A protein has these predicted regions:
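Active-site/acyl-donor-binding loops of N-acyltransferases
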Residues: 1-14, 84-88, 96-148
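Amide-forming acyltransferase catalytic core, primarily the GNAT-like/NAT-type
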Residues: 2-82
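Sequence-level detector for tyrosine residue identity
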Residues: 35, 55, 68-72, 89, ...
Length: 148
């Protein structure tokens, strides 16, 4: 599926709460099936290896009972590889909690075109991390977006 790239400022909310880096791979797979029922998932052992590689590269997971997000911090911007939530308000709460943790004021979010979060916002872009990174990348590394 094509992707939508959304760049937005993150409003400050000192009361936004979420937990960080506590989402197990088993729970991540469960949540993916809830939010993206048609997604293709690797076996749990392979997902463990991919998540380990991503954590080593600085990935952070923000989650609460209404959604989750996987992101890297780059300067003043949180770059979300994946954001899934019950609705826009729940997604905003995840963004705000991540802002309070990192101090970053902006978000760059990749959404699957069929996701209903921030419907109609953002611009359409090609599939995969090529659009996300904006530069060549080694194809021997884990390619996380292929899993959605």
């Amino acid at each position: 599926l094509p992707l939508r790239l959304l760049q937005i400022p993150i409003r400050r909310d000192l009361l936004a709460q979420a937990v960080f880096d506590s989402l197990t791979v088993h729970k991540l797979v469960e949540m993916r099936h809830i939010y993206q029922p048609g997604c293709i998932c690797l076996p749990e052992q392979a997902m463990n290896e991919i998540m380990t590689q991503l954590y080593r590269r600085g990935l952070t997971v923000v989650s609460n009972r209404r959604g989750y997000g996987l992101y890297y911090t780059k300067g003043d911007t949180l770059q979300f590889l994946e954001l899934q939530a019950d609705n826009d308000h729940c997604a905003d709460l995840l963004l705000q909690a991540a802002r309070e943790k990192t101090g970053a004021q902006n978000a760059r979010i990749l959404l699957a075109e069929n996701q209903t979060l921030y419907l109609g916002a953002g611009r359409r872009c090609g599939y995969g991390m090529i659009a996300f990174l904006g530069r060549p990348f080694p194809t021997t590394d884990a390619y996380f977006r292929m899993l959605l």
